[in-house]
Amino acid sequence: MQKFSLERALSLESKYDDSLQTRPIGDWLSKFVLWFSVLFALYHYVTAGIGVPVDFWHMGAHMSGVIVLIFISFPAFKKLKAGGEAVDVMGRLSGVPFYDWLFIVVGVMASLYVGVTWYGLDLNFLGFSFSIPEQVLRMGVPLPIDVVFGTLLIIVLLEAVRRTIGIIVPIIILLFTGYAVLGPYIPIQILKHPGLSWSLFVNNMYFPDLGIYGVTLWIVSTVVFHFVLFGVLAQRIGLGQFFVDLATVADADEGQATGTRLLGLAEHIPSGLDAHI
């Protein structure tokens, strides 16, 4: 049986797993991604031990980190995944187009907006004042700025999902979104319903405990992430192969002991029976 080495595993992954076909980036950005990933992982493991921050900050930080890594690593189109060295050309920074940097900035701002404005926000700048009431007063009646940031986050997440796992899931999401918002205009009577306004839809999708910042993201950021990361690290350092080898050795020892016991038993079989055997 062919030994399942790390090199063979990486080769199979790069061949069949489309989500691992990332784009080439520059040296300084590669170092940034490395250290950002290390700090991102340490944040999750440290907070798992000493206690996570309040949900709207923790999930916002988790979402921000994921958005940064996705839009740096995954190009918009598959044809951009071809190998080659990353160069700084017009419209690109260390191999990453400026529209992807825009996605990162918008996604991080929209992810952290809920935490920043949770207890309200009062801004005074150059004689202009801007006030946002605390989040509990905006539930069900979101402000226009809430709708803007919520819409931006939905767009960014749809694009992130498309880049990482394909177009099918975003299409399904858009179909159900259209069904929720365009209910009164559906021609099939049995499917028609009053529908939701876009602001109410964004309210349900954007604010915690309801949509994007609901139970699923909380479980992923507090439990699932840690197990997935441990599995990846175990594979990369050869821990998986260690357990395979350990099982093989244990099976070999057990097989040898079984063979010895069978030979010992055969010595005590009567000669007549032995002849028949």
Tell where the protein language model's regions lie, with residue ranges.
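Membrane-embedded alpha-helical segments and adjacent helix-loop junctions characteristic
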Residues: I154, L182-H276
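Hydrophobic alpha-helical transmembrane segments
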Residues: V148-L152, P170, S221
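Generic alpha-helix detector with strongest preference for long hydrophobic helices that associate
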Residues: L10-E13, D17-R23, M90-L93, I132, ...
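Structural signal for alpha-helical transmembrane segments and their membrane-water exit/capping regions
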Residues: A41-I50, I70-K81, G107-L126, V141-D146, ...
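Conserved, well-structured core domains of diverse proteins
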Residues: M1-V141, V147-T151
